[in-house]
Amino acid sequence: MNPREFISNLPDEILGKILSLLPTKLGVSTSVLSKRWRNLILLVDNFDLEDSSTSGFSAFLEQTVARLNTCPIKRLSLNGRHYRFSSADSWISTAFERGCLELHLQSQYLDTGILSSNTLVKLTLSDQIYLQGLVPHDGTVFFPALKTLSLGAVVADRDVYESLISGCPVLDELSIRDGCDDPPTWKKSVVNKSVKRLTVSFHHPMSAWAYEDNVWFKTQSLVFLDYSAFVSQGYTIVDRMDSLVEARLDLRLWVSTDSYDSDYEDKDFDVYRPYDVFGDVTSLVSGIRKVKTLHLSPDSLEAFFFCCNHMPVFNNLRNLSLESDEEKGWQALPLLLNNSLNLHTLSIKGLVHRVTSRCGDACACISERKTGMCCLSACRIKVLEITGYGGSFIELKQMRHFLGKLQCLETVRIGVERDGNNEHLRANLSSLHRASSECNIQFI
């Protein structure tokens, strides 16, 4: 049986599924093959419409919609910045009328009047979509069944933007990405009672004015938070995030902290003391204090130290994951360890960090005679995970410090870099003194 006969012998339902996987323009073109293929297009429920040219795209879509006026639509992906404003609204409305479950839109303009569907469960609005229309009333429900909402750099009035987020009463996952060269579009607030997973990326290094107001969160059902942005003036947590299980923070400072490393107790330091670091993350850090797993970027470690007036107690924290950078310090690490009494696992990607006078005794940057009681000695950490270990003198010194101070360690997992003499590195690490007799070193 040749391939052509094999395809022809497939059931209509299977051929319809195959056509749904093709770009819609290609799938529609098969209707010229025969009467059977002309009818098969009616089984397509997944439409991917894209064209970068101005000529023919609108006509093609209008003809397609007209031919498929009885077809159910499960998924619609619409990408075309050159078609008419009214045509796009018409196509989207048609998809909603036919029970569309998933909509991905990349266009120029969208009328807020059509943002209503009882069936839609996933919505993606890409960069530079302009939402236009009347401001919705308070309490307006746009999508009663929507579970996932993804917003690029969507341009809209504050009331429209915020109402779109709050108008999804069963929302599970919200993603906001705003970091292009154009002016900021995110309104720095998320208000939704049901959202469980929230991802925010807000990076505009040339628009410092956009960070001068507080960031608002009213997300009492939140379970997972991934927040990446330059630090703002402040943060307002309207309802406590008591349900939060995991948080990933990448909080970037606006200035280098090189000039802030001197000892504040130095009698001559006040003469040269630098200005306060912009931003206050105290409320944000306090808002996530019930978290069980916390991931911090190198910048976040510095933000926790310079922009947090009071470090809360993390009673529920079991897993702490850090990433190091040779230009960023570990100033906040002693505070975190002292306030995480039930910490079980400490994971660090890279041990090399900037040496400062503020790292405290969590690292080996300063001589032991200046530290007194080491914060590591009181830690109950049972698992230490180190990745990206290169075997340098500084790294070996830090490992000696960890193994010699952490008295409850049971397992140490070390990921050694591929370059270098691995056998020599392993031998050096295995020979280090261990404060815990139960400590077992594993190489991964």
Swiss-Prot record:
SUPFAM superfamilies: F-box domain, RNI-like. SMART domains: FBD (SM00579), FBOX (SM00256). Transmembrane segments: none annotated. Residues 4-50 form the F-box domain. InterPro entries: F-box-like_dom_sf, F-box_AtFBL13-like, F-box_dom, FBD, FBL60-like, LRR_FXL15/At3g58940/PEG3-like. It comes from the Eukaryota. PANTHER family: BNACNNG35480D PROTEIN, RNI-LIKE SUPERFAMILY PROTEIN. This is Putative F-box protein At1g64540.
